[in-house]
Amino acid sequence: MKIKHIVSCFFVSLIGLSACSIEELPYNQLTEDELDGSYESLLSATRGNYAVFKQTAFHQGWHYAGELASDNVSLSGVSSDALMYIYNYQRITDNYHMSNMWGWAYRSIINSNKILEKAQEGESKEMDQLIGENYFLRGWLEFVLVNVFGRPYNQSPETNLGIPLN
């Protein structure tokens, strides 16, 4: 009986230790090695950049920043959500709506930069199309971030430069 218990403990620990070397890669993301400069890998990464716009965390923050801080929306009642700070023109550094928007936008900007580093201009019309799309995506996201987080130009333009570009 004792030997059965020892053998069963041995097999359980053997199975447990063998699971330590399992490395699961994300099924919907590319690794740095997979982004090899081929058209297919760059197309897949560009599609991933477009997927950012479906993220609630991105478009919700963008919508809140533009609409709640304007006269287009009227909130009534009491809420403990951080959107009330936006509605009342109170900027707080830990507003998760704004930090999520910032994070998703910069994730796509960084991905566009990586794609633009790997892509070879003039290789084909399709590759040039991808390069143009990534320049547009990066520029548009930087434009959105400056509109939401940047200061007006007349408020110390020497020190308030907008957003970090890299």
Predicted regions and their residues:
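Bacterial Sec-dependent N-terminal signal peptides
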Residues: M1-N28
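Secretory-pathway/luminal and periplasmic proteins that interact with or process carbohydrate-rich
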Residues: K54-Q60, V73-S76, L141-P152
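Membrane-proximal, proline-rich intrinsically disordered regions
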Residues: C20-H63
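A structural signal for short, hydrophobic/glycine-enriched beta-strand patches
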Residues: E40, G48, Q55-A57, H63, ...
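Short coil/linker segments at helix-helix boundaries
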Residues: V148-N166
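Generic, ordered loop/turn and secondary-structure boundary motif
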Residues: E23-T31, D36, A69, N88-Q90, ...
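Conserved, well-structured interaction surfaces
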Residues: A82-F149
